[in-house]
């Protein structure tokens, strides 16, 4: 494999994981903070808030996993080689 393609693939994989983690990380922090605030305001709605929070956290985490999959494809099954 060409060393330039190999180096570009490693950099692209690093960017894929890094950028894919920034958005969901910020979103998960905001969602958890708002959920805690909502539970503090209405303790009787805790079950509904928690269920909605966990579902939304799972969807946000899926974006990070997609970035990891792209990085693994670039590193081990490089389509540009």
UniProtKB/Swiss-Prot annotation:
It is a multi-pass membrane protein. Its main location: membrane. Gene3D superfamilies: F1F0 ATP synthase subunit C. It is found in: Cellular thylakoid membrane. One of its GO terms (cellular component) is plasma membrane-derived thylakoid membrane. F-type ATPases have 2 components, F(1) - the catalytic core - and F(0) - the membrane proton channel. F(1) has five subunits: alpha(3), beta(3), gamma(1), delta(1), epsilon(1). F(0) has four main subunits: a(1), b(1), b'(1) and c(10-14). The alpha and beta chains form an alternating ring which encloses part of the gamma chain. F(1) is attached to F(0) by a central stalk formed by the gamma and epsilon chains, while a peripheral stalk is formed by the delta, b and b' chains. The gene is atpE. InterPro entries: ATP_synth_csu_bac/chlpt (IPR005953), ATP_synth_F0_csu (IPR000454), ATP_synth_F0_csu_DDCD_BS (IPR020537), ATP_synth_F0_csu_sf (IPR038662), ATPase_proteolipid_c-like_dom (IPR002379), F/V-ATP_Csub_sf (IPR035921). The keyword Nuclease does not apply. It holds the Pfam family ATP-synt_C. Keywords: ATP synthesis, CF(0), Hydrogen ion transport, Ion transport, Lipid-binding, Membrane, Thylakoid, Transmembrane, Transmembrane helix, Transport. One of its GO terms (molecular function) is lipid binding. The chain crosses the membrane at residues 7-27, 57-77. It comes from Nostoc sp. (strain PCC 7120 / SAG 25.82 / UTEX 2576). This is ATP synthase subunit c. CDD domains: ATP-synt_Fo_c_ATPH (cd18183).
